[in-house]
Amino acid sequence: SQTEPDKGDPMLVRTLAACAALFFVCAPFAHAQTAQHPLDPLGWQEYWTVLEVLADAGHLDEGTEFSRVQLREPDKSGVWNWTPGSSITRSAFAVVRQGPQTYEAVIDISDSRLTSWTELTGAQPMWLEREFGSGASQVKEHPEFIAAMERRGITDLTFIDCIAIPPGYFGTVEQQGRRIGYVYCSDARGVRNTWTRSIGGLTVVVDMEDGTVLRVVDEGVIPVPETLAEYDRASLGQPREVQGPIHVSQPLGPGFTLDGHQVRWQNWSFHVRPDSRLGMVISTVRYRDGDRDRPVLYESSLSEIFVPYMDPSFAWHSRNFIDAGEFAAGGLTKPLLAGRDCPDHAVYFDHVVAGDDGRPGDRPNMICVFERVAGDVSWRHIGDPKASRPKRDLVVRMAAVLGNYDYLFDWVFNQNGSIRIGVGATGIAEVKTVIEADATTRPVGETRADAHGRFVAPHIVAVNHDHYFNFRIDLDVDGPRNDFLIDRLESVTLPEDNPRRSVWVVDETIARSESQAKMTIDYNRPAVWRVASESTTNQVGYRTSYQLMPGSNGN
């Protein structure tokens, strides 16, 4: 569903007037609303249908938990051929936990029946929301943990907060056949931001199925720093004044139209849906060319975020986070702040998310859509005549919050027919506490405290790490029959009588397998991927195609 900007927004009256005039839907959808498109997310009542069907089949009790409940997408060809007003068959897919057992279920929502119920073996589902906080009571009562805290001068555990996280899997005997959590603790006394108050060098290994403490690993006492890292307004004081406010307004309302989860802007049309694990999914992207809506892309979304930390200590070597696959409990995305995360004139999509018990809950402002004019130039040439075209984009944005990191993801639709995916990482760097105060206080003969990171505050080191963002992109350029090409720049030596000596040419190769399509970004061997239609050519005889152009790496 979509929601209007916050009622304190000075643009509200004008926006609502424009919405009424242009028949935009600006109010939240009712819980009972039925799907208007085959790829619409599950609605409130559909989640309840899932629960009722599982209960009727004898697969639901007080201990049943859900790692995932989502739309089970219909057949791709059926989606492309669907027309508004046609009937829609709805199904759901669920990952269900019952004690140590995990099951995959397919539920026919339209007919209220269970289609399949399959036990998974040798696999671990996503973590549940409750698991991150579970095990703390057993840990704080364990004698080895109490002794380790006493060695640090801490005898009152009242304000010690502990959290369990999934460690990287290394196939150790301890990990095999178990759902393991590593528990880390911090001193929350008198602070909001506890990232700088961690109990350094102390890790507790817990069996998440029954809460059993398997071992307590103490790598040495590190005093809890007194360094504060609060970021609330009261702690930071008066912010830097910014002269000359900039206002962007759309007195006639947005330049795009919404019909449920379908968006139309200039020549673009597409479907957007929130998704609890992936954040959002962009589907059925078409571009209007004259009197034809030409297919460009069937579906695209984030598929995974991999964040490995580069510290060999026990407390850190296992921090190889699979963010979307392990940490998306309760929904990968979190609400966007109107007027700050998105401009005042943005329109929002709400979402319904299943909790650990499978029951639906409302999540407002999960996706925003807005037009962006940043003063950039789309195209220009100064000749006769002088010509320039201002740039105007349509942005579809979500924000993921995973522990200390906040990620912003933009799908940007451009007027020139291109689509750009932008990723931004912000939030708080994950840090460890160290004995040394800074880079100048290294003990003689010992390993530097910042050997695997950088000091960011006294006794605080931000640990080196990577962020790998993986996206699933299913292009259907002028239809589903496409070739995956690699265009490589090859140097060609010219005859000796040519003063140029050499030029480069483009060598086009069709990749027939994933191994053939693999490519390392190497500026000494330039190449790009391209997806080309098998059946459609452009006005000069080339096959219509889209390039996949990776951005910068290693920043």
Predicted feature residues:
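Short, non-transmembrane alpha-helical segments in secretory-pathway proteins
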Residues: 38-80, 128-171
